[in-house]
Amino acid sequence: MVRVIGSLVFGGLILLLASSNAHMVETRFGPLIMLAPHFVVLGITFFLGFAIGIVLVFANVMKRRKHKLPGKNIVIKR
């Protein structure tokens, strides 16, 4: 987990250093207006979509665990 966070921070620093020469794009998220380099905005939207996909997969896995087959839950006591 620490490696993943560290690599994301390192990648973010590379993006910030590389963004000094990129053209700026104004992006509006409702009331929030963000002025950022174009590829940074594309990266943010990509990673947000990736994170939403991971959350949906985990939600489906948790639903499957809750809905086990009825035969496995029946215990016959004698």
Swiss-Prot record:
Residues 60-78 are cytoplasmic. Disruption phenotype: No magnetic response, no magnetosomes, no iron crystals of any sort. MamC is mislocalized in a few punctate spots throughout the cell. No magnetic response at 30 degrees Celsius, a weak response at lower temperature. At 30 degrees Celsius magnetosome vesicles are smaller, sometimes align in a chain with the filament, only a few have very small crystals. Other, possibly precursor magnetosome vesicles are visible. MamC and MamI mislocalized to 1 to a few patches in most cells. Deletion of 3 consecutive genes (mamJ, mamK, mamL) leads to cells devoid of magnetosomes or a magnetic response. The chain crosses the membrane at residues 39-59. Its main location: membrane. Induction: Part of the probable 17 gene mamAB operon. Belongs to the magnetosome MamL family. This is Magnetosome protein MamL. The lineage of its organism: Bacteria, Pseudomonadati, Pseudomonadota, Alphaproteobacteria, Rhodospirillales.
